[in-house]
């Protein structure tokens, strides 16, 4: 399904007619700069995402073609008018292809800069995102590309697509005989298939099946390094890693192959420090250690031809350019320079040939290309009213709160903001306890809570974010007073890493970014689980527990974009509350301002999700029909209820507008 949306959809660059005619609502460059800093778009957006003159998010899938832009807010509204359901993934295959070109270009520059004679090859590990649209977009990019598999199912997908590229295939993960035989079949078909030995028991099966198929195996070895990265994924590297061979086992593998007359089959050295490496120093240390394995294996007579440094190339989810778990303190060029220099230096020092360098950079290729867009279905916000004095005979705790409120408005008072806040908190605590004991009425409790909110609001206005001593109080008050936004999505399905490992993703409204973010909000999903909430948000150069929000109409809140969800999230998403896959569209943007949208995934229906848990929709419909027939409802109402039930079975799992 393809829709040409070039008619009626303005692009956000080259908007010579539509946007230029709306200068009365266009924001100043100063306002734009402030919004970019608030959400750090300039850093995590990586030139793919920006704020246009209308205060809308714009997307430039290929920064080398800056005139090819689309207003994302306008695109979503146009799609909604055409029947697009939310939540939905908006995928930009051109970003995938630009990421691939950028990584290849960085390594080309590094090789030229350091006089490195070996080749470079990017291998895409499909575990990061196995969707056909992703794999085929990368394969059809025109760039050299290999594929990596970590299971039998992935290897079958890779082999089927390999005919389009005739390229390198790397086989990682634990392997049984069927997996190994599939890989050897690929080698026999003419592909370069590297079977990476992860444990010693695999080598006997490899040699046995290679003989059966009369094929020379192409082998790799994964060395377990002492070096280890830091962060959420550090356990995938280091001496305690689940994968790889220790130094003793590497020697044992070499001798086993020598005795079998297959030492020439060992052609690839592989290591992996961990995913999303935040610190370039950790990467440099790991590459230097692995380079020693390359040198020592050559001394043992092993002609290693490929040096696979694995994954680890991170992306800056926060936009803080730091060593935090969800950021990186380096760019593509520095990453490539460190790898090429370390390997080349070891080769020059020992008079060895420069091997082909392979990286398995999945996250860095796919993260940016997908945005989850959803609608806010409800807002709960604190409204501040002018407080009235309590009755003269009101209990002491109420009188105390009122006295604090009056003192806050007296000129020249010497008490601190913190002291006012603490006094009001203690009074409110006493009132809550007294309410449970029957001392205070419901009306008195409500009055105290409303007055406390007004006091918090008053204190907040007088705090200075630049004053370090004020920051803890500001954070506390922002959490207490933030708007609660109920968003039509499942955190567990669409952003499982935000729940499982507390990963941060950029989240912000798609419009209204021409206004100062005066409000704060927390985002809650529609699952029946208190964990279904986003706990951390980008806020300038730091991370906050509430999200900056421009002023908005609570009856018509803006759509929200959840950015950089292209790596792992679609694959790891689970079925909590039986919320399924969202709809997905591929968006192509062209220099003339035209946009082409293709529906790539219709999303799961309720029936789809029920079948996952062995609940047959037809059986459920029959059971429901039997119940309805036994009621004393009239025939017309019975038929109406049956039709509604059946329509619901084959409808979207998310909330839909009537």
UniProtKB/Swiss-Prot annotation:
- Carrying N6-(pyridoxal phosphate)lysine, the residues are 127
Q: How does activity depend on pH?
A: Optimum pH is 8.4.
Q: In which pathway does it act?
A: Amine and polyamine biosynthesis; agmatine biosynthesis; agmatine from L-arginine: step 1/1
GO terms under biological process: arginine catabolic process; protein homotetramerization; putrescine biosynthetic process; putrescine biosynthetic process from arginine; spermidine biosynthetic process
Thermal behaviour (record text): Optimum temperature is 50 degrees Celsius. Thermostable. Active from 20 to 80 degrees Celsius.
- A GO molecular-function descriptor: arginine decarboxylase activity
Family matches, as InterPro entries: Ala_racemase/Decarboxylase_C, Arg_decarb_HB, Arg_decarbox_C, Arg_decrbxlase, De-COase2_CS, De-COase2_N, De-COase2_pyr-phos_BS, Orn/DAP/Arg_de-COase
The protein's name in its UniProt record: Biosynthetic arginine decarboxylase
Keywords, in A-Z order = Decarboxylase, Lyase, Magnesium, Metal-binding, Periplasm, Polyamine biosynthesis, Putrescine biosynthesis, Pyridoxal phosphate, Spermidine biosynthesis
| Gene designation | speA
Anything further noted?
ADC can be found in two forms: biodegradative and biosynthetic. The biodegradative form may play a role in regulating pH by consuming proteins.
List the subcellular locations. Periplasm
Q: Where along this sequence does the record place binding of substrate?
A: 307-317
Assembly information from the UniProt record: Homotetramer.
Q: Which family does it belong to?
A: Belongs to the Orn/Lys/Arg decarboxylase class-II family. SpeA subfamily.
Q: What induces it?
A: By growth in an acidic enriched medium containing arginine (biodegradative form), by growth in minimal media at neutral pH (biosynthetic). Putrescine and spermidine repress the speA gene and feedback inhibit ADC.
Question: Cellular component per GO?
Answer: periplasmic space
């Amino acid at each position: 399904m393809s829709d040409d949306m070039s008619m009626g959809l303005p692009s956000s660059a080259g908007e010579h007619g539509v946007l230029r005619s709306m200068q009365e609502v266009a924001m100043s460059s100063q306002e734009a700069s402030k919004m970019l800093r608030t959400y750090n778009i300039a850093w995590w957006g990586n030139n793919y995402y920006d704020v246009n003159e209308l205060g809308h998010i714009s997307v430039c899938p290929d920064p080398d073609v800056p005139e090819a832009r689309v207003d994302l807010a306008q695109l979503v509204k146009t799609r909604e008018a055409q029947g697009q359901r939310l939540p939905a993934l908006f995928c930009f295959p051109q970003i995938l292809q630009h990421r691939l070109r950028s990584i290849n270009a960085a390594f080309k520059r590094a090789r030229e800069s350091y006089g490195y004679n070996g080749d470079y090859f990017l291998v895409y590990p499909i575990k990061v995102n196995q969707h056909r649209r992703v794999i085929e977009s990368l394969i059809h990019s025109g760039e050299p590309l290999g594929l990596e598999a970590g299971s039998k199912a992935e290897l079958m997908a890779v082999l089927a697509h390999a005919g389009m590229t005739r390229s390198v295939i790397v086989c990682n993960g634990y392997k049984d005989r069927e997996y190994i035989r599939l890989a050897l079949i690929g080698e026999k078909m003419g592909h370069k298939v590297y079977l990476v030995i992860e444990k010693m028991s695999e080598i006997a099966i490899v040699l046995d099946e290679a003989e059966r198929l009369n094929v020379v195996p192409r082998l790799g070895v994964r060395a377990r390094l002492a070096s280890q990265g830091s962060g959420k994924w550090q356990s995938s590297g280091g001496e305690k890693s689940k994968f790889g061979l220790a130094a003793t086992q590497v020697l044992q593998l070499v001798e086993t192959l020598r005795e079998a007359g297959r030492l020439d089959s060992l052609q690839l050295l592989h290591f992996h420090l961990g995913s999303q490496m935040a610190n370039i120093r950790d990467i440099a240390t790991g590459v230097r250690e692995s380079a020693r394995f390359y040198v020592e294996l050559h001394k043992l007579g092993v002609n290693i031809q490929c040096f696979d440094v694995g994954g680890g190339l991170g992306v800056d989810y926060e936009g803080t350019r730091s060593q935090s778990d969800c950021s990186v303190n380096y760019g593509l060029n520095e990453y490539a320079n460190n790898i090429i220099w370390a390997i080349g230096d070891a080769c020059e020092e020992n008079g060895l040939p420069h091997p082909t360098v392979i990286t398995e950079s999945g996250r860095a290729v796919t993260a940016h290309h997908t945005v989850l867009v959803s609608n806010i279905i409800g807002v709960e916000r604190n409204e501040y009213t002018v407080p009235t004095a309590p009755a003269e005979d009101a209990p002491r705790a109420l009188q105390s709160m009122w006295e604090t409120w009056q003192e806050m408005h007296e000129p020249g008072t010497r008490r601190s903001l913190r002291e006012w806040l603490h006094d009001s908190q203690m009074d409110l605590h006493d009132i809550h306890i007294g309410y449970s004991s029957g001392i205070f009425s419901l009306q008195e409790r409500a009055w105290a809570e409303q007055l406390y909110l007004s006091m918090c609001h008053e204190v907040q206005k007088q705090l200075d974010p630049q004053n370090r001593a004020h920051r803890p109080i500001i954070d506390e008050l922002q959490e207490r007073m933030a708007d609660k936004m109920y968003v039509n999505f499942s955190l567990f399905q669409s952003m499982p890493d935000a729940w499982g490992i507390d990963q941060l993703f950029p989240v912000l409204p798609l419009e209204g970014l021409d206004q100062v973010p005066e409000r704060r909000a927390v985002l809650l999903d529609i699952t029946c689980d208190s964990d279904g909430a986003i706990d951390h948000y980008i806020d300038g150069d730091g991370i906050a527990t509430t999200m900056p929000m421009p002023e908005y109409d609570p009856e018509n809140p803006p759509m929200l974009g959840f950015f950089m969800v292209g790596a792992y999230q679609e694959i790891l998403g689970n079925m909590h509350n039986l919320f399924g896959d969202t709809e997905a569209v591929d968006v192509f943007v062209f220099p003339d301002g035209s946009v082409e949208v293709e529906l790539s995934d219709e999303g799961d229906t309720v029936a789809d999700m029920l079948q996952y848990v062995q609940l047959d929709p037809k059986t459920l419909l029959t059971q429901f029909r039997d119940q309805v027939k036994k009621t004393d409802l009239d025939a017309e109402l019975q038929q109406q209820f049956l039709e509604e039930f059946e329509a619901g079975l084959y409808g979207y799992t998310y909330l839909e507008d009537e």
